[in-house]
């Protein structure tokens, strides 16, 4: 507006000066009349032009104002429509955002509660997993212990199976011995019948001699007395032989009874064979004496005095035989009692081991079931946890997507609102300018007035209403962890928890003391025959069978090389007694058992026959089985000792030389002091090859523990009871062998 007024002033001033209109002093002095007239005319013309231009300008201004007012009304209507639409959109957006905010708040609250529940569940799961780790470690330890026990049980079962096979072999051998004894008893019965017949013949001869020898009454009376004595002796012999038959029958019954229970009867078989040989010897002596008696009775007329002496000798021999048989039968009864006690102990051991194995199998089954149950529970829990975690991840992903969508929508809406607000501000500014221009153009601009004084400050306007509460913003990032506060006071004791889960089974207690052996029960009735079992595994190689029948004589073959000298044979039956020879000089009688065997020539390797050479030592691997002390004595009789294993090479060589699954004694024992194993020469072993878990000094619940060492079939060392029966290995230096051979 100021610029317009300045332009009008400049135009007016320019026009006045141009037409020569100056101050009044100059006009009054210099102007002429024509000039005044001409100037007045020009003034009228100018006034007319000015009125025309003002009318034209007013008309144009009115047209422009009409156009402006129409545009303003249309713009107002459009802006009012837009504002109503924006208000409706804002209301809709407010409602939607409120609903969405409520739904998101509810969803966030539920999500937070779910997350808290999941955290609680995860804590419980971690606690359970920690507990389960402890239980699993315990189960693993118990499983390792069970594996060790199973290995020990397998070894004991293998040893028991090996013992059972050896018992079966001994039973088979004992059956053969029993058949031989039965044959011997039948032969003895035949011999007794022959002797009875010969005794009857002798009695008849004596009666005939009594009838014929009437003249020699004194001699006959003495002979009759002697004959009566002999008849009484013969009757006693008959009674003794009948008792022997009964004893043999009882022994047969006892052997049948022992077949079902005995496990190791080799010593009994050897004793029975020795007893049978002794009985054969006594019977042979009796046969020889009876033959001599018959010869003497034929020559009784000439040598009656010799007959009386022979009868006295017979009585003495008979008494000695009776005493010997009584002593031997007492020894047999004592041995039978010992065998019965051994059988009872063996049966109790077998029952104890069977019960122990049953308990172990039941414990193993329980542990397996508990392990499988816990593993299935853990797998189910883990699968459910995996499923819940997968669901949580899916829900969190979907919630994040929804939050991203909501944020993008809010951003777009806020951007739209900001654009609309800026447009509204621009429209308001344009409207204000138009209104100002409209008020200014309504009248002609007047002259510029003087500058007025500054007005007083108006009173402050009323305070506006309080706005609505804004929406809750998003939670900010978590702040840094504060310092740890002081320890609070101890809380009150909590409630007593529920009953915990059942703990793992404790370790097995120590072995109890063995009970007293119960009385022997009566033999039960034989049960019905069971169904035929499955075909078993091939058993170990059995003992050599009995000698078969003699075959047909074949053609003589090519003579082979001369063999080694054989063992001395069984002494044959004594021949008939010859006539008495002249008395010879008295000499020392050497028994057969103490006679030295012929020493065989040593082999080329410097060791005797049946001995094997390794480095500078000779080794003897026995075929027979003995207890530890007997094996020691056997090796000492061979001028050797039980083997001392000092190197790994020697151990490997001995392992290769061992045949089958038999155990062998070695010269190692802790009989002097427990758990101090020493060789028989008193030295401690430098090299050791004990089996895992050995020596354990297991006493089997009877008597002392295991104090003697031996080699098992795997070549490892194990401790045994010194009363066990095993093979053995003897050892001696090759130099001593060579010197003795020279």
Swiss-Prot record:
Residue ranges the record marks as coiled coil: 73-141, 215-328
Lineage, broadest ranks: Eukaryota, Metazoa, Chordata, Craniata, Vertebrata
Binding of a carbohydrate, residues: 691, 694, 696, 706, 718-719
Residue stretches making up the C-type lectin domain: 614-731
Subunit details: The extracellular domain forms a stable trimer. The extracellular domain interacts with fibrillar amyloid-beta peptide.
Subcellular compartments: Membrane
Membrane topology listed for this record: Single-pass type II membrane protein
Transmembrane regions listed in the UniProt entry: 38-58
Molecular-function annotations in GO: galactose binding; low-density lipoprotein particle binding; metal ion binding; pattern recognition receptor activity; scavenger receptor activity
CC terms in the record's Gene Ontology section: collagen trimer; collagen-containing extracellular matrix; endocytic vesicle membrane; extracellular space; membrane; plasma membrane
Gene field: COLEC12
Record-linked Gene3D superfamilies: Mannose-Binding Protein A, subunit A
Stretches in topological domain Extracellular: 59-742
Protein name: Collectin-12
Stretches for region Disordered: 439-608
